[in-house]
Amino acid sequence: LAKTDHLAILQFGLRHWLEWRSRSPGEYPDLSEAHLPNLNLRGANLSNTNLSKANLTGAMLLGANLKDAILSLATLSYAELTEADLTKANLVGSSFLHASLRGAELVGVNAIASDFSAAQLQNADLGEANLSGSELRKTNLRGVNLSHADLSRTNLLEAELAEANLYKANLSQANLREAHLTGVYLLGANLSFSSLEGTDFRWSNLSKVNFQGANLSRANLRGANLTKADLTGVNLQGTIMPDGTIHP
C-alpha cells in the first residue's frame, strides 16, 4: 500500500488499524511526516512503523507497541507513553519534552541527540540504550534501568535518578550538576571528565567508578561506597566525603 493509504487506515479508526495490521503482518507502515497530534493510539500496534518527522504531540500511546519503529526527528512532546514498548526503536533527534514514559520498555533504543527534558521515565527500562548527546534536564529517571547505557555528553542537570541502575553505564563528559543520585548502583560506570558539582550521591554504590578528571566540588558522597574508584585528577573542593567530613 502507498503511504497515503496507511495514513487513511489509521485515521479511519484505531480498531480498523489493528484489524488491518493483523491481516498484513508483512506490511511496514509508512506514517513519516504525518500530523497526528492528540490522536488516541492507546494499545496500537505501531511496530516496524516509519514515524520519522511525525507530529505526535500530546498523543495517547499508553501501552502501544512501537518495537523497532522509526521515530527519528519525531515530536512526541506531552505524549502519553506509559508502559509502551519501544524496544530497539530509532529515536534519533526526537523530542519527548514533558512526555510520560513511566514503566516503558526502551531497551536498546537509539536516542542520540534526543530531548527528554522534564519527561517522566520512572521505572522505565533503558538497558543498553544510546542516549549520547541527549537533553535530560530535570527528567524523572527514578528507579530506571540504564545498565550498559551510553549517556556520554548528556545534559542531566537537576535530573532525578534516585535508586537507578547505572551498572557500567557510560556517563563520560555528562552534565550531572545538582542531579539526585541517592541509592544509585553505579558499579564500574564511566564518569570521567563529567560535571558533578553539587550532585547528590548519598548511599550510592560507586565502587570501581572511573571519576578521572571529573568535577565533584560540593557533591554529597555521604555513605557512598568508593571502593576501587578512580579519583585521579578529581576536583573535590567542598565535597562531603563518605564519612561526612567536608573536603577542603
Task: Name what the model sees in each region.
Residues 7-8, 16, 21-248:
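Tandem repeat scaffolds
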Residues 1-2:
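Terminal targeting and flexible regions in eukaryotic proteins, enriched
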